[in-house]
Regions:
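Catalytic-core regions built around general acid/base machinery
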Residues: 253-279, 297
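Structural recognition of the beta-strand scaffold that forms the well-ordered cores
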Residues: 28, 67, 94, 135-138, ...
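Short amphipathic alpha-helices in soluble, non-transmembrane regions
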Residues: 41-48, 78-86
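Extracellular S/T/G-rich loop segment that most often corresponds to the catalytic His/Ser-adjacent loop
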Residues: 139-141, 148, 278, 293-350
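Short acidic, glycine-rich surface-loop motifs adjacent to enzyme active sites
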Residues: 223-260, 283
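Protease zymogen maturation seam
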Residues: 2-14, 20, 55-63, 83-135, ...
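Subtilisin-like serine protease catalytic core
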Residues: 123-156, 164-215, 227-230, 241, ...
Length: 350
């Protein structure tokens, strides 16, 4: 559901320094048992909370997740009492986080296309350029589907908010990321190319009003799984700006003890992806903290990517350490951008 407050007002966002922002009028009900019936939980929720001010705005039968919308001023009380009011089900209650993009426009104009040589792309193409049998989902802020980098290869496009294939341009992040993953090789000499230019592109928009609720991100990933994506790129995540001032030992303790509910949720999504032989690829994050703090990065079955600069040293912003699987160029990276142009960007997204 789009991010809205009461009466369609501005999003009721609670800003929390050092941890992800949350939407004040939503809660997640996450069923502990994979065999539980989320339809039954939805029915019992409405029996316990029959007033129209309590509503169900999303659910997923496979992830066993229910998203409810409630009055902002009742959120804390409902968190404390909802389990006892719906005693026939075991579920975890946690907040709806708001995620952000892991990339931004770069001021770099020198050595455009350096990343293509750094990863020895042409040598890699002697093995494969990808295949039209392979679908790569780009779960992001939208895409310019008409960009020449993507001609004839867009499939199963989806907007989780409008529930159709009408995608916006967003901030250009999705267009840039898609170009790096599966953009045409025709622009290699200009410094732009996808790594796997023969693959199909499945763009999935999970941003509304420049914000991505966690429920929208989960819905986007699940759409990709249900539509047979072979790879799902997720260059989106929670912000932990400011935590880099903490000693690494304290960060490690946070990674071990905090954000466990969201970690459980992602573990179930990753398990479902593994059953479908789908690879989930996450950007590690740009907060200069341990990669293991963002809970989506804690799954062995996914691939988590950190960023290096032109010297192949870690960028100043990249997350690092435990749960990092591979590093790739992420500074001054040239790729497709709206409208019908190209742009350098920085980030673990890249």
């Amino acid at each position: 559901a789009p991010v809205m407050g009461e009466g369609g007002k501005e999003p009721p966002i609670v800003k929390q320094p050092g941890v992800p922002n949350i939407i004040a009028n939503r809660l997640f009900l996450y069923m502990e048992n994979e065999n539980d019936n989320v339809d039954a939980l939805a029915r019992d929720f409405k029996q316990a909370y029959p007033d129209d001010k309590y509503s169900i705005i999303g659910y997923d039968k496979e992830v066993k997740l229910l998203v409810i919308q409630i009055p902002e001023n009742e959120r804390d009380q409902i968190r404390k009492t909802i389990n006892s009011k719906i005693p026939n089900h075991k579920f975890i209650v946690f907040d709806e986080e708001v995620y952000e993009l892991h990339g931004q426009i770069s001021n770099s104009t020198e050595n455009v296309g350096w990343h293509l040589n750094a990863i020895h792309l042409k040598q890699g193409w002697t093995y494969t350029k990808g295949s039209s049998d392979v679908k790569v989902a780009i779960v992001d802020d939208g895409i310019q589907a008409s960009h020449p980098m993507f001609k004839g290869r867009i499939v199963d496009a989806y907007n989780v908010f409008t529930q159709n294939n009408a995608l916006s341009l967003g901030e250009g992040h999705g267009t840039h990321t898609a170009g790096l993953a599966v953009g045409s090789a025709d622009y290699f000499s200009k410094g732009a190319s996808g790594v796997a230019p023969n693959c199909q592109i499945m763009p999935i928009q999970v941003f509304d009003n420049k914000q991505c609720p966690l429920s929208a991100l989960i819905a986007g990933v699940m759409y990709a799984l249900h539509h047979d994506a072979d790879v799902v790129n997720i260059s989106i995540g929670p912000s932990f700006k400011g935590l880099n001032v903490l000693p690494v030992e304290q960060q490690a303790e946070i990674a071990k003890t905090q954000f466990q509910n969201v970690a459980f949720l992602w573990a179930r999504v990753c398990k479902l992806a593994a059953k479908k032989n789908t690879i989930l690829v996450f950007a590690a994050g740009n907060d200069d903290i341990l990669t293991s703090i963002p809970p989506e990065n804690r799954n062995a079955s996914s691939i988590v990517v950190t960023a290096v600069d032109k010297r192949l040293y870690p960028t100043v912003f990249t997350n690092y350490g435990p749960c990092s699987d591979i590093s790739a160029p992420g500074k001054g990276i040239y790729s497709s951008f709206p409208s019908n142009t190209f742009q350098s960007c920085d980030g673990t997204s890249m």
